[in-house]
Structure formats: structure tokens, C-alpha cells
Amino acid sequence: MPELRTDRLVLRRWRESDLEPWAAMNADPEVREHLGELLTREQSDAAVALMQAEFDERGFGWWALEARETGEFIGRAGLDDVDEDMPFAGADAGVDIGWRLTRTAWGHGYATEAAMACLAYGFDVLGLPEVVATTTVNNLRSQAVMRRIGMTRDPADDFEDPSVPEGPLRRCVLYRSPRREHRRKSS
């Protein structure tokens, strides 16, 4: 797993010391507002083991986020395979980009900074043709990050997430960033 560095962040391999703050994030109703149920410590630990194994297997996945100035764990960001049951899945669906930060890390631009590093890795290192991002229609903070990193949304692509039960979290938006757009914006 390569380590990525930005001006203020380190995107790195998960450590044992990340497990407690990661579990606290997953037990925080505000952090999980647009994600559904809260996770137990055991579920959070299992998620880290799975994320690490998938990254090692595929060459991409979820990095732990660390604030460079303090060394503090502040969340995760990365790239993931698009689930096969998503309505937009297919040969050209690319991968999904995402982020999740501790509440204390909100509002500082960390999600945008981490996402830009993940996009660059996806396009420049992995050679991905496209990166997508999804969130609930009500998650305006994440949608703002998607726009700030240059992704675009066509409302015709909005969808019902088949993995989510009926309710306010089921309706989702889809943002896209084709490789050619990334090249144009980074030139």
C-alpha cells in the first residue's frame, strides 16, 4: 500500500492505534447520518481487516487519514470497486471514491484534499478511465466535496440504492469524473 502525502494529510496503511478512533467514528450518529446503522467495535475492526486485505489484493482501496501536523487519525479516504448490484455498474463504471472523517475534522477541507490525492492516484497511477462517487440525496456536504474535486452530476443518473432498505437513505446521487476531465483540469 503506497503512502500518499498532501500538504496537510498522510494517506497511509491502517495501524492498530487507528482501531479505537475508527470505532468511535462508526458509533457516532452524526458521522453515520447518511450511512445507516451504527457499527459495533467488532464490526469496525472487521471492516479495517477487510479494507487492508482488499487494498493489498487490488492495489487500491481505503487509506487511513492522518493529520500531518498532529499525527492524529481523522478518518479514511480511498477508492473502491463499484458494487455489481448498482444500477450504473458495468465495464465502464470505474471505481467509487469516498471519504469519512471524524466530526472534529469536518469543515477544514480535509475531505477535498484527500479526495484530490485519491483521484490523482486513480487516474495517474492506476490509469482508471473514470471515477464515480455516490451519496444520499440529502448529504449536501459530500456533494459539495464532489463538486470541488471537479466531479459532475446528471440528475438522470440518480438512483435507488438496492442495498439500502426503503427510507430516506435509499435515494442517491451519482457524480462522475472521467479521466479526460481530470487531465484537462490538472493541466
Label the model's feature ranges.
Residues 1-20, 24-34, 49, 66-187:
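Acyl-donor (CoA/ACP) binding surface of acyl/acetyltransferases
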Residues 30-51, 60-63:
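Conserved GNAT-fold acetyl-CoA-binding loop/helix
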